[in-house]
Amino acid sequence: MKLVYSTDCEYHIGLKASDIGHYVILPGDPARSEKIAQHFSHPHKVGHNREYVTYTGTLCETPVSVMSTGIGGPSTAIGVEELIHLGAHTFIRVGTSGGMQPDILAGTVVIATGAIRFEGTSKEYAPVEFPAVPDFTVTAALKHAAEDVQVRHALGVVQCKDNFYGQHSPHTMPVHAELTQKWHAWIACNTLASEMESAALFVLGSVRRVRTGAVLLVIGNQTRRAQGLEDIQVHDTENAIRVAVEAVKLLITQDSPR
């Protein structure tokens, strides 16, 4: 079922096909859309409805867009579904995360190679046994971009959750024993970071046959705090944004007819 306004705009994001490029960067924070758009040539705002703030410009003379998704899987899935209706085919999430391994310091850029589906949205797309993995071509482009811009980065699995405070205040939850046991299990499995959107994005991408990827700034590390190690806080997302933008340029070049 496709819901549109009478003006043929998609119902939630308020956009039509001519508003967007086929390559879309997806921050969670609406305020970050404008910051990312400043990396485009000729950026202009094309939409602002609910949590979905959208700018379109060009990279390598190709139309590209940035649209915020808000927090979590449901709003991410709604936004991406509607962008797919409009013809978008490549999506890179740019967001923040919390480090889980003690050597993943704040300021590190994590490129997700898979996501733990500890959330609900992806379960309405595919059985729980189905893996949440990004597109290999997009992930490779993110890796090359991180190397090109020379930022500290790591590749690995991330954990996706629906309850932010279930992670940070598990003792206040009736299911605290399960939350704590699984958290330690994921750390033992070498999960790099925790966030809230990638699992839904990756599974949706597989189901809808579009390309997805994710690059995440680590803003802090509660494992380091628990071990009595220094845990600085880093909130500047510029390095993650640069990696995403350069990856889009690489993908455009690779996709261009030779």
Swiss-Prot record:
One matching Pfam family: PNP_UDP_1
Biological processes, Gene Ontology terms: nucleoside catabolic process; nucleotide catabolic process; UMP salvage
InterPro entries: Nucleoside_phosphorylase_CS, Nucleoside_phosphorylase_d, Nucleoside_phosphorylase_sf, Uridine_phosphorylase
EC number: 2.4.2.3
Entry's localization field: Cytoplasm
Family affiliation: Belongs to the PNP/UDP phosphorylase family.
Protein name according to UniProt: Uridine phosphorylase
Organism: Treponema pallidum (strain Nichols)
